[in-house]
Regions:
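Active-site-adjacent substrate/metal-binding segments within catalytic domains
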Residues: 2-127, 136-158
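Substrate-binding/catalytic cleft of secreted carbohydrate-active enzymes
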Residues: 96-113, 118-235
Length: 235
């Protein structure tokens, strides 16, 4: 994808016409991204594709996982080199994997500058999360804070609830309770999409990866939504 025009906005907090010391610099772009998710007349299944400024594109890229197990060794120069390599390899998309963490601002700034799209998981992966009032409140704060921090970035194309949880519930033979299913639906198909709609209503939300749209319905279908091909690991 072509590089975005990125505009910086400097915001200063005031109270009673006096600067209160709060300053914020936001980077914004003019890219319009939609997700085409609709039935096709000529084939069995549904489209699932990026549409950028009205043009449907083929997503090419990779998962982005933490660059180093020692997080303090990560810096802007190192990330810039990695994302330059992605751009020069003709990537147009990166998926921020839900088994990692919410990244520093400079990662998103560089993606804005290099015209890379981000499929952004929330930080839930490969586990069953039991809800309590305290945990739900903690999750809500985390989602709100990070969506508010990142929503102005032109690179953010999609918010996704989790990595591989729906398909694990559907296909793995681990002990499962009715409460686990209830908590899953409440967290990824009610609470998080509700928060995203409140904080970033123009962005598309997808409940899990892979998924056919949620509710444990053939989550890794090859002709609906997105799919994970695990055969790359074990043939």
């Amino acid at each position: 994808l072509m590089e975005d025009e990125v505009y910086d906005s400097h915001m200063v907090g005031q109270k009673d016409d006096v600067d209160d010391g709060r300053n914020m610099l936001l980077s914004e772009g003019d890219r319009m991204v939609a997700i085409v998710d609709k039935s096709e007349k000529k084939v069995k299944g549904r489209n699932f594709a990026y549409e950028v400024n009205g043009l449907k594109i083929f997503a090419m890229g990779a998962d982005y996982i933490p660059e180093d197990n020692i997080l303090t060794r990560q810096n802007r120069a190192r990330t810039d080199l990695l994302l330059l390599s992605a751009q020069e390899s003709h990537f147009n998309t990166l998926r921020v994997w839900g088994g990692g963490y919410f990244l520093d601002d400079f990662f998103y700034d560089i993606c804005d500058e290099r015209g890379l799209l981000i499929w952004h998981d929330f930080m839930f992966a490969c586990a069953s999360y039991e809800l309590s009032n305290h945990f739900e409140e903690n999750v809500s704060i985390e989602i709100r804070q990070n969506v508010r921090r990142l929503r102005s970035h032109a690179s953010i194309a999609l918010w996704c609830g989790n990595n591989e949880l729906e398909t694990q519930y559907e296909n793995l033979s681990w002990p499962q309770t009715r409460k686990q299913y209830y908590d899953y639906i409440r967290l990824y198909e009610y609470l998080i999409p509700k928060l995203v709609k409140e904080e970033d209503p123009e962005k598309f939300y997808w409940p899990s990866s892979p998924s056919s749209g949620g509710n444990f319905e053939n989550s890794n279908a090859e002709n609906i939504g997105d799919t994970h091909y695990w055969g790359v690991w074990h043939g």
